[in-house]
Regions:
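Hydrophobic recognition helices of helix-based DNA-binding modules
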Residues: 5, 49-50, 116
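Active-site regions of enzymes building and remodeling cell-envelope glycoconjugates
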Residues: 127-132
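Short, well-structured N-terminal submotif of metal-dependent ribonuclease cores
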Residues: 1-38, 54-70, 112, 121, ...
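Alpha-helix capping/helix-boundary segments
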Residues: 10, 42-43, 86, 105, ...
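Active-site neighborhoods of divalent-metal-dependent phosphate/nucleic-acid chemistry enzymes
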Residues: 59, 73-119
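Generic structural signal for small/hydrophobic residues in well-ordered secondary structure
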Residues: 8-9, 46, 90, 109
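Short, conserved active-site loops that position catalytic residues or coordinate cofactors/metal ions
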Residues: 40-48
Length: 132
């Protein structure tokens, strides 16, 4: 089974509102048959959005960052970083989607041949395996 990358909303839902995950997404994250990872890009995106207006539907705690990292570490879900090759790949992606965080996550999934857990309707325009 391919490694699975979680997009930012999948990270947030997994950690703070798992009932908002689709059944397929929850199964992929929890089934233990394949490796699951999340991106440092998600922490960056959450930090910027929290500084602006937050996520009113999710009511994140002040220590959201520590809870995400520690919670995923307990589950064996690793964090991946941003590499130069991911930055270069963003340049070559079609402009179907404008959000820079999502574009970087798409590039990471493409470059590493990961499947992606995402409810983003544009994700299938970039990736061949999107789970939701």
């Amino acid at each position: 089974m391919r490694t699975t990358l979680l997009d930012t909303m999948a990270v947030l839902r997994s950690c703070f509102r798992p009932e908002l995950l689709s059944r397929r997404a929850a199964e992929r994250i929890l089934d233990g048959r394949g490796s699951v990872v999340f991106s440092m890009v998600s922490l960056w995106e959450i930090g910027i959005k929290m500084a602006r207006s937050g996520y009113p539907d999710l009511e994140l705690p002040a220590d959201w960052d520590e809870r995400i990292v520690a919670g995923f570490a307990e589950q064996g879900i690793a964090m991946i970083g941003i590499e130069v090759k991911h930055c270069k790949m963003v340049e070559n992606l079609p402009m179907h989607h404008q959000d820079p965080f999502d574009r970087m996550i798409f590039a990471q999934a493409l470059q590493r041949d990961f499947s992606l857990v995402s409810s983003d309707l544009d994700a299938p325009l970039y990736l061949d395996e999107v789970i939701w």
